[in-house]
């Protein structure tokens, strides 16, 4: 039958049917959603209108994530999908979509921090001055995540359209908001 993005098949406000006076057109076509899963990388090219290409990611396992307050971006491994405002089904099936909250591997950021500041992240050092310096640079909530080995991040690209899974590390108010939402879900 084919997925169509027309409105001829819709009913009127009163509930009556519209008379269908023309067939489906090529420019109204829709495609099934990619539902990008967490796994080894698999990206397919899709030819679109005007000869343009879309990159349909079927499986992804890594992406470029930026740490906004430190102004650094690193390629890192996506470990898990933990929250999605759209649907719990997308969390259960580990589907990567825009604005999904995922956990990423903090190792690349730890290495950068070590080379840039000369300080260890996530480890409680014996030197109190070093730990004070780290505390001044990185908020407590982020330090806890670095020590646990799982950073919360948000996907800002569209994996089903561009074939990439890029995003940013959650910080500040946004991190607190999503933490509260996840705690609320756990309690229910």
Swiss-Prot record:
Biological processes annotated in GO: translation
Any one annotated GO CC term: ribosome
Biased composition (Basic residues): 7-26
Keyword Chloroplast carried by entry: no
InterPro entries: Ribosomal_eS8, Ribosomal_eS8_CS, Ribosomal_protein_eS8_euk, Ribosomal_Se8/biogenesis_NSA2
Pfam families tied to this protein: Ribosomal_S8e (PF01201)
Location of the region described as Disordered in the Swiss-Prot/TrEMBL record: 1-34
Keywords for the protein's UniProt record, in alphabetical order: Ribonucleoprotein, Ribosomal protein
A GO molecular-function descriptor: structural constituent of ribosome
Family assignment from sequence similarity: Belongs to the eukaryotic ribosomal protein eS8 family.
Name of the protein in question: Small ribosomal subunit protein eS8
Gene: RPS8
């Amino acid at each position: 039958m084919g997925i169509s993005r027309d409105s001829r098949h819709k009913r009127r406000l009163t509930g009556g049917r519209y008379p269908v006076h023309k067939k489906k057109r090529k420019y109204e076509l829709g495609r099934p959603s990619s539902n990008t899963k967490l796994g080894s990388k698999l990206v397919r090219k899709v030819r679109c209108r005007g000869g343009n290409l879309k990159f349909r990611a079927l499986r992804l396992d890594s992406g470029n994530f930026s740490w906004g307050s430190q102004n650094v971006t690193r390629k890192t491994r996506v470990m898990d999908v933990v929250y999605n405002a759209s649907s719990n089904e997308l969390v259960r099936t580990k589907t990567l979509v825009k604005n999904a909250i995922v956990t990423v591997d903090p190792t690349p950021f730890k290495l950068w921090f070590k080379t840039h500041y000369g300080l260890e992240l996530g480890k409680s050092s014996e030197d109190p001055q070093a730990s004070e310096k780290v505390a001044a640079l990185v908020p407590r909530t982020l330090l806890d995540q670095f020590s646990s080995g799982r950073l919360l991040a948000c996907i800002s690209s569209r994996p089903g359209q561009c074939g990439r899974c890029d995003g940013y590390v959650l910080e500040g108010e946004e991190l607190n908001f999503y933490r509260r939402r996840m705690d609320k879900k756990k309690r229910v």
